[in-house]
Structure formats: structure tokens, C-alpha cells
Amino acid sequence: MSGMSEQRPWGSYTVLEDVPGYKVKRIDVLPSQRLSYQRHARRAEHWFVVAGTGEVTIDGRSMPVSAGTSVDVPRGAAHRIANFGDVELTFIEVQHGDYFGEDDIERLDDDYGRAGTGEPQASSPAAATTGRS
């Protein structure tokens, strides 16, 4: 469904396009937040950073990213993006595969108590510091 926005503990995403074969999202990561270290069984992803700075980790290897950086995340690769800056980090994510549900997430590590689940929980960024998820 295009135009759908979801809040997450680390920020938010908006679905820009969702059609058979691919899905496109705009993802905004709040300062000092990061996504789960996760992998997907049924999709690959391509990220293009449009604003901010941060760090991407893929299968244990980290690299800095900033506006203009492009990153390929192969299907099954463990990955995360972190915003260590003081402004939002925004990137466009293009998913390619045969299934794009939010339940195709295996969380390996998560700052918000969701590791080991595919459950997308929306909560405030304060949950990371208070221990609530």
C-alpha cells in the first residue's frame, strides 16, 4: 500500500511504492538510533542515503555512509543502519524479491527488546533508555 507510514522506536518509514516484485520505502532514522541487526529470507534490499550520516553493517563489516552513498544488502545478509549524527538520517530502500511483509525479519540484535522476533513494535525512542519495548 503506497503512502502508508509507520512509526518505529528508531524513527519511521513511508511506503512509496508496493507492487509485485518490488517495494520502495523512505526511511527516517532519528539521531542516536539504529535499526535492528536483522536479515530477510525472501528479499534483497538496496539503500540510497539522501540525507544525514551514519554507519551500515552487513554481515559484521561496517562502513560509514552519507548523502549519496549506495549500499546493496543481499538476501539473507545480516544488516543494520545506525545514525550516530545529530540530525535525521534518511534513505530510500528498494526491496526486491517475492515477499515484502514486515514479518520477514529475523532480528539478531535489537536495542528495543525485539531480538528473535519478526514483530514490528511501534514505541517511543525513550524505550531504548528505559528498558521498555
Protein language model annotation of sequence segments:
Residues 1-8, 80-133:
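Double-stranded beta-helix
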Residues 16-19, 26, 50-53, 72, ...:
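A structural signal for the main folded, soluble domain(s) of proteins
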Residues 31-33, 42-43, 61, 77-78, ...:
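A generic "binding-loop/recognition-motif" signal
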Residues 42-55, 59-60:
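Glycine- and acidic-residue-biased ligand/ion/polar-headgroup-sensing regions
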